[in-house]
Structures are given as C-alpha cells and as structure tokens.
Amino acid sequence: MGLLDFLFDKEQAQVRRIQKLKKTLTNMYVQPPERKYAIQTLRDEGTPDAVRALLARFEDNAPNTTVDGDEKTYVYESLVSMSADPDLDVRGIITNYLRGREEKINWPMKVLTDLLDYQEMISLVCELLESCGADYQRNPEKKQELVLRSADLRSEELSTELLRFLDDLNETIRFLAVEALLKHDFKDLIEAPLRERLREEESLRIVQKIADAFAANPEWKIPEEEREDIEAVLPNEFALHTEGYIYQRHA
C-alpha cells in the first residue's frame, strides 16, 4: 500500500467515525451518556466535519427537556472552545450552516454571539434577513428569531432592513418588527413607514404599539389627507389633535 492509499484510508476511516458519532448524537432514544460521549469525541476530533456533526444536535429535541437543555449547552460550550483553534473556522462553518437553515437557529446564533463582535453580528443578521421575504411562510421560525434578535442590535442598516417586515403577512413578525424599529429609534427613518402601517393595520396590539409611539413623539404629524383614515383606526384612548399629532386622552 502506498502512502497516498494509506492517507486516503485514514481519511475515510475518520469520515466513517464522525458519521457514526453523529448518528449517536442525533438519536434521541440512546442513553444520554452515549450522546455526551459523542459530543466529547467530536469536540476532540476538532475538524470541520466534527463541527457540522455537533451542529446537528441543535436540530433535535430529547424527550426530557432538562437533558435536552444540558446537552445543547454542552454542544454550545464545545463549539466555543473549538473556535480557539486558529486552523478551524468554526465561525464560518456555523455561518454557512445558518444560511441553509429555516428553523432551530437559536443555539447556533447563541454560539456566534460569543464569537462575533457587535458589528459582525449586525452584518450577519442583515445578511440572513435579506434572504427572508415578507410573504407567507408555512414556518416563519427563522425570520421570527432574526427579527427578535434585531431589537438588541441598534443599527440604521438593520432598521432599514426591518422596514420590509412591517408589511409581513405574519402578524407576529409585524409586531416584532415594530418593536425592534421603535427600540432602535431612528426617528426620521421610521416615522413615515409606521404611519402607513397604522393606516392599514388590523391587529389591535400593533395599532396600540404604533399609537403609543406617535403619542410619545408629538413632532410626528399626520398629513391632512391621511387624518380621516388614522382617526378611524385609533383606539378609544387616543385622539388626533387639530394640529395633526396623536395624543392620549386623559382618563
């Protein structure tokens, strides 16, 4: 057997070993100690394929929620520790993994929160949101997680990206987008889009949230041609002043 044959066989053996460990790790019916051993062994392997195998654990839920949380925490800690290896691009592998996922991204995002700085996380969330449309999705979990995380990442670039989701067909996404935009508080950017959303919105909690924001910003005036529409949707505790601003009625 030549050297190249030996190296090829060694590489194939490693691939088979990682596949076997991944199969154990993602089998929710084996004993927890077996899955823990698989996590430890994959961590020690320290290869890109081992990182991908560990990420697969985030895709399944163990029947016991305590065990499930403990194992996912262990995987999270293992991935963070593996990132210390300068020859192992844990960040890049997880980022590519997230690009192809439509659900269960919370734990991989949690790992990246430890590995990326603030601006890098903003750029990542912006990139991932760009691939999310505002149309109907059977499972909007990824979009919802990203919009939710956006609230804690104040950035005009991210606020601009979030504006699309004011028109999302999913009410929860619209509500979270409003919350995030108000938390970012780029007033000149959000005033007109929020006013338009207020005119069209049917969800009471979203109308309430936007009306509260307008009442807190009396400099946000409603154009005369839009006042009739706005008055028609305002909850009873709000009113529209003749000067065009929304205010809260006194009890």
Predicted region positions:
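Amphipathic alpha-helical scaffolding segments comprising HEAT/armadillo-like alpha-solenoid repeats
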Residues: 11-26, 47-63, 84-98, 118-133, ...
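Terminal, low-structured helical/coil segments at or just beyond the last alpha-helical repeat
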Residues: 225-251
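Charged, low-complexity interaction regions
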Residues: 29-31
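Detector for Asparagine
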Residues: 27, 61-64, 96, 106, ...
